[in-house]
Design a protein with these regions (language model features):
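Active-/binding-site microenvironments in catalytic and ligand-binding cores
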Residues: 1-263
Length: 263
C-alpha cells in the first residue's frame, strides 16, 4: 500500500466514524483561567477580551465579526522553544518558523488521574513513565507524551483550576528526571491538562520549571490546558496541535485535536 492509498483509507475511516476526531481544547473567552505570576516577578497576561465589531447592524448590516485580545499562552496553548530563555537561540523556535511536520504526531497518554485525585501535587517521575512503557509499549522518537490528570474538570472554576494558597499553586506535573527521560527517548514534546506544562511547585526544583527549562533547551514543545484526554487510548491516537503562525510568536492558543480509532 502506498501513501496515497493510506490517505484514502484514512479519509474513508473518518467519514465512516471508525476514526473519531476528539476535541482536546477548552473554550477561549473572558472567563478562561490564566496563569497568575508573583507580582514582584513579572507582569501577568491580561484577561482575554472579546469585542463585537458588528452583528447585522449599522456597523455591518450583512455580517457578524469580533476582534479578540488574547495572550499567546492563554487557554489550551502551544509553547514554542523561544518561550523560555533556554530555547531563545533557535532560529526555528518561533511559531512562524517551526516545521509544520512537527504539528502532527502520535501521542502517548499516561493516565495519572487516580493519583492526582488523591494528591494535587502528584509528580510523574521517570520510573512512572518506564512502568507505563512496560505495560503499553515504548515511547518512540517524534511522539508526544501527555499526562492525563482530568484537571480539565476544574476549568470552569478558576480558583480550583489554579489551586493556589499562601505557599503557591498546587497542581500535578513532571519531575526533572521525567522530562530528561522522555527527551532521551526522542519525544517531540510534553503536554498537560493544567495551566502550564510544569507542576505548581516546580519553581523549587533543580533546575526550576524543568518542562520549560529542559524541553525548550532541546528545541522541543509544550502543550498546556489540554482537555478530554480521558477519551484517548494510552497509545494509537494521532495528536494535531498547530499554533497560529504569529510572527516571532513564543506560543499560541490552539484547537488541539486527536484522531482516535473506534472500530
Amino acid at each position: 500500500m502506498n501513501s496515497a492509498d493510506t490517505l484514502s483509507n484514512l479519509a474513508a475511516l473518518l467519514l465512516s466514524g471508525k476514526v473519531e476526531v476528539v476535541d482536546l481544547s477548552g473554550r477561549l473567552g473572558p472567563d478562561t483561567p490564566l496563569l497568575k505570576l508573583p507580582p514582584d516577578f513579572a507582569r501577568d497576561t491580561p484577561k482575554i477580551e472579546l469585542h463585537k465589531i458588528s452583528e447585522y447592524d449599522s456597523d455591518g448590516p450583512f455580517w457578524a465579526w469580533n476582534w479578540l485580545k488574547v495572550g499567546e499562552h492563554s487557554g489550551t496553548h502551544f509553547d514554542a522553544p523561544h518561550h523560555w530563555i533556554t530555547g531563545k537561540d533557535y532560529a526555528d523556535g518561533y511559531t512562524d518558523s517551526i516545521p509544520v511536520q512537527n504539528f502532527v504526531a502520535p501521542v502517548n497518554v499516561i493516565d495519572c488521574s487516580a493519583e492526582t485525585a488523591k494528591n494535587p501535587d502528584f509528580l510523574l517521575d521517570a520510573a512512572g513513565v518506564q512502568a507505563w512503557e512496560a505495560k503499553h509499549g515504548e515511547i518512540r522518537k517524534g511522539e508526544w507524551v501527555v499526562m492525563r490528570t482530568d484537571w480539565d474538570s476544574r476549568v470552569n472554576d478558576e480558583a480550583a483550576y489554579l489551586n493556589a494558597d499562601a505557599t503557591g499553586p498546587h497542581s500535578p506535573g513532571p519531575t526533572v528526571d521525567c522530562i530528561k527521560y522522555i527527551l532521551s527517548k526522542g519525544a517531540i514534546g510534553w503536554g498537560t491538562q493544567c495551566i502550564g506544562t510544569d507542576a505548581g511547585q516546580a519553581g523549587g526544583m533543580e533546575p526550576p520549571y524543568p518542562a520549560h527549562n529542559l524541553l525548550h533547551a532541546a528545541n522541543k514543545y509544550g502543550l498546556a490546558s489540554l482537555a478530554n484526554l480521558s477519551k484517548l487510548p494510552a497509545k494509537g491516537a494521532i495528536l494535531i496541535a498547530a499554533p497560529l503562525k504569529i510572527v516571532s510568536g513564543t506560543g499560541s492558543p490552539i484547537r488541539a485535536m486527536a484522531l482516535v480509532p473506534r472500530g
